[in-house]
């Protein structure tokens, strides 16, 4: 039998990528990877290491000890071989810290959101999501097979109207507690009241609230709403706790259900022991060094003053609106050239016309570092970028 006939392919099936790349480049929306050195040579105002714990010696030692005891990997799904005492200890301690009855670890904050939203909804459910909800919550809504209503940012009346007009038996309201792009706070008390009027569940992503608001325990705890039976929290271990992983925190019945029903939990390898050990140690540091959350907010306020941002920051995030993506890129590059690394948010991360510098404060910023930030940010924002603000 002869060799199969080769049909020539005149056009690569990936040729369309070239056109997409050109469009992104022309719009100033290309992204690239830039490895960071093991010892930073620039002032970091871009990472999510809010409490400065990723390099804390106790946190590193917690990860090292877990590696020595449990090995490098979890070795499998937590339902098979990937569960350890360490995982369950962190779940219990984190739940107690935020005032929840129980917790369940996931491999990231992203998968925690997928697991919670998809696992607690499905066909015949209504999901009401804030327009600025994190991408992981957006993707969870898409995967849920539920009907989804996206409401304007922080618009409680729109949420109430969506719940009031529903035909579905089950409903869920989804929001960040602290919105990542601009650092604004969700109206959690009002959202919970709307949920209770219409028998809906409230799911809150505390990724940017944990370690910063409520003395570290999160915005829900700060408002006196922790432990509510109709609220589920999600969070990440990769921001304030300086490690990696995610968690769903809420009633014990939710934990039990997600173990049975959350596909990102069932079919994913358990969180690596080193990450669990580091996060557990970080939680211990957060409890012991209670000055850290307040220092984050104080440093954020100082950064906002430097950048002439009129709103008082309510979180670690300071958003400097520049509008045009090319202007934002140029400003971020100028800061980096001067020794200060800042975030640069452009579409599709933020809406068109709202490209910005995103600064994140850390508890561990020294007076000398704040002075460097003042000098560089003032020079950059009073330069070419200022004309476009």
Swiss-Prot record:
Pfam families, per database record: Aminotran_1_2
Residues that coordinate or bind substrate: 31, 134, 349
N-terminal signal peptide: none
Reaction(s) catalysed by this chain's protein: 6-carboxyhexanoyl-[ACP] + L-alanine + H(+) = (8S)-8-amino-7-oxononanoate + holo-[ACP] + CO2
GO BP terms: biotin biosynthetic process
Involved pathway(s): Cofactor biosynthesis; biotin biosynthesis
GO molecular function ontology, one term from the record: pyridoxal phosphate binding
N6-(pyridoxal phosphate)lysine: residues bearing it: 239
Documented EC number(s): 2.3.1.47
Domain of life: Bacteria
Transmembrane segments: none
Annotated positions binding pyridoxal 5'-phosphate: 109-110, 180, 205-208, 236-239
UniProt-listed Gene3D superfamilies: Aspartate Aminotransferase, domain 1, Type I PLP-dependent aspartate aminotransferase-like (Major domain)
Protein task: Catalyzes the decarboxylative condensation of pimeloyl-[acyl-carrier protein] and L-alanine to produce 8-amino-7-oxononanoate (AON), [acyl-carrier protein], and carbon dioxide.
Subunit structure: Homodimer.
PANTHER family, alphabetized: 8-AMINO-7-OXONONANOATE SYNTHASE, CLASS II AMINOTRANSFERASE/8-AMINO-7-OXONONANOATE SYNTHASE
Assigned protein family: Belongs to the class-II pyridoxal-phosphate-dependent aminotransferase family. BioF subfamily.
Protein name: 8-amino-7-oxononanoate synthase
Species annotation: Mycobacterium ulcerans (strain Agy99)
């Amino acid at each position: 039998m002869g060799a199969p006939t080769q049909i020539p392919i005149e056009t690569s099936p990936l040729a369309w990528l070239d056109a997409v790349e050109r469009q992104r480049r022309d719009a100033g929306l290309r992204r690239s990877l830039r490895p960071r050195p093991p010892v930073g040579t620039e002032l970091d105002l871009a990472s999510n290491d809010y409490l400065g714990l990723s390099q804390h010696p106790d946190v590193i030692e917690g990860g090292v000890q877990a590696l020595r005891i449990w090995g490098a990997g979890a070795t499998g799904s937590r339902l098979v071989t990937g569960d350890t005492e360490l995982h369950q200890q962190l779940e219990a301690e984190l739940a107690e810290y935020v005032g929840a009855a129980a917790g369940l670890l996931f491999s990231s904050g992203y998968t925690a959101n997928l697991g919670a939203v998809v696992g607690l909804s499905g066909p015949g459910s209504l999901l009401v999501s804030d327009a600025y909800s994190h991408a992981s919550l957006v993707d969870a809504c898409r995967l849920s097979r539920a009907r989804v209503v996206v409401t304007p940012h922080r618009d409680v009346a729109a949420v109430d109207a969506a719940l009031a007009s529903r035909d579905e038996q089950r409903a869920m309201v989804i929001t960040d507690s602290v919105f990542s792009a601009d650092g604004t706070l969700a109206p959690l008390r009002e959202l919970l009241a709307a949920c209770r009027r219409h028998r809906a569940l409230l799911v809150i992503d505390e990724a940017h609230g944990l370690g910063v608001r409520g003395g570290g325990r999160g915005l829900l705890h700060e408002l006196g709403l922790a432990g509510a039976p109709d609220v589920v929290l999600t969070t990440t271990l990769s921001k304030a706790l300086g490690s990696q992983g995610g968690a769903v925190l809420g009633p014990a019945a939710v934990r039990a259900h997600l173990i049975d029903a959350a596909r990102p939990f069932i079919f994913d390898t358990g969180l690596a022991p080193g990450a669990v050990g580091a996060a557990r140690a970080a939680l211990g540091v957060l409890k012991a060094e209670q000055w850290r959350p307040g220092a984050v907010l104080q440093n954020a306020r100082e950064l906002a003053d430097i950048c002439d941002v009129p709103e008082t920051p309510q979180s670690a995030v300071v958003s400097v609106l520049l509008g045009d993506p090319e202007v934002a890129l140029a400003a971020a590059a100028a800061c980096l050239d001067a020794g200060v690394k800042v975030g640069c948010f452009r579409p599709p991360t933020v809406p068109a016309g709202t490209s910005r510098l995103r600064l994140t404060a850390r508890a561990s910023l020294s007076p000398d570092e704040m002075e460097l930030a003042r000098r560089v940010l003032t020079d950059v924002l009073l330069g070419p970028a200022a004309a476009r603000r």
